[in-house]
């Protein structure tokens, strides 16, 4: 993972890392306790559950070949009243991180979502402020940066190897922010966040969904180590992205989340194998889904992605080993 983030040819295989992996229960046959279920437990019950969580998560990582794993994040809501899945309240996420690090040792890099850079916000209040009260948006960007840096420090002290800012700045049609807004509210903060994170000895990763083509060149010059998503559903092509950023960025993801959810294992295998053949020689590629791997993703589909990685993920594998008729992805 470190070699990929430093844009060097990995010594053995292309690393696997997911922005968030939610299919722990399906992959293990056990149960990871998160969110409000964890919050309802007594302190003693929470401590016990977090130890079990760490055991399950790390064992699944080893089974699937992950080089890195993202720890549960802070509370946020997918929609009003709908809590995100991979979250823990308050300081529980830091305690869970500590236990994950103890279980994983130095074999698996621990990654945390620190935040640090604004995301697009489609609320009327935010959109109006962009045009009529930009100082308010700038103050929010300052606060987000300060919070992200403090979080990164805390995770650094607990043994993190990398942090990411989940900062969606585009949708499927293109950038949310205008060029002037990017220059004021986004790009300077990416640079400052990446510089601060590097000063802590951590790698700096940015996640953004959407069609980022218009800003790839400038993002590659911000000091980021990696960009995660390369969103296939938004028409982001990995080879075209690589031509723009060259060796300036490690590219993470690009396996279509929709394909993982609804596709056939054979199609997932073929798409992943083609992606690996295209990118592994760069040494600046991390295999994974274009966004979180949801609980609803069938495990045979995810294991088809892993099977392609086993066949095509090594630097010495240059041929196309399609053994689809006999593959068993269970």
Where on the chain are the PLM-derived regions?
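Active-site loop segments of alpha/beta catalytic cores
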Residues: 1-46, 50-56, 62, 66-76, ...
